A protein has these predicted regions:
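Structural signature of tandem alpha-helical TPR/SEL1-like repeats
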Residues: 1-5, 27-39, 61-73, 95-107, ...
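Alpha-helical segment of the N-proximal tetratricopeptide repeat
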Residues: 1-8, 15, 19-26, 56
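Helix-start (N-cap) detector for alpha-helical repeat units in TPR-like alpha-solenoids
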Residues: 14-15, 48-49, 82-83, 116-117, ...
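Position-specific recognition of the canonical hydrophobic site in helix A of tetratricopeptide repeat
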Residues: 18, 25, 52-55, 59, ...
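Alpha-helical adaptor scaffolds
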Residues: 56, 83-99, 103-133, 137-139
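Terminal, low-structured helical/coil segments at or just beyond the last alpha-helical repeat
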Residues: 161-193
Length: 193
């Protein structure tokens, strides 16, 4: 509410709009966040944070063409943007352009081979391509690099479940829960173990 109050005095204050939009995102009010990010971009068409977050909202809405426009604008401004490139790889995956997604992720892994998140992202694409063995190799590497990355255990647990390796799946789901994933989120998977 204090952000809204401040905007009464400076309705186009970009930092205030960005802060309020971030709070809206954290509280699941993406429609309001979207409005604020649009207002920021009306004032500053090159605002990288607003482009990135609006593209993310477009992905949530499944408005992939609009997301692509924002990611491309962001990457024109900052071709090395980690979040922009990872977002574009995610977009390619959502559009089932798996090769394009892998190309982006492979380049990023070459540049930063110690980034566990990139291995998890690539493993997810490989899983969708039905290359579970490659995905498991990437997940092993991700866990080696960062043993507290819950997403790696979640994805590996789901792959194990698909492969009918229920004991391994259960162990990974339990590890993900110990790392902060709510039990309710994994209730269905655990019942299948």
């Amino acid at each position: 509410e204090s952000y809204s109050f401040a905007l009464n005095f400076a309705p186009l204050a970009v930092p205030i709009l960005l802060d309020r939009a971030a709070i809206y995102m954290e509280t699941g009010r993406t429609d309001r966040a979207y409005t604020d990010y649009c207002r920021v971009l009306d004032e500053d068409k090159q605002n990288k944070e607003a482009l990135l977050m609006r593209a993310y909202i477009y992905i949530l809405r499944r408005d992939y063409p609009a997301a692509r426009i924002d990611y491309n604008r962001l990457l024109e401004l900052d071709p090395q943007s980690y979040s922009g490139r990872l977002g574009l790889a995610t977009l390619e995956q959502k559009e089932e352009k798996f090769r394009e997604s892998l190309d982006i992720l492979n380049k990023m892994i070459v540049e930063t081979p110690e980034d566990a998140t990139l291995y998890v992202a690539r493993a997810d694409v490989e899983r969708e391509m039905k290359h579970e063995d490659l995905a498991l190799v990437d997940l092993e590497e991700a866990i080696r690099l960062n043993a507290s990355l819950a997403d790696a255990y979640l994805l590996r647990g789901n792959i194990y479940l698909m492969q009918k390796k229920k004991a391994l799946a259960k162990a990974d789901f339990e590890k993900a829960i110990s790392l902060g994933v709510p039990l309710a989120d994994l209730h269905e998977q655990l019942q299948q173990c």
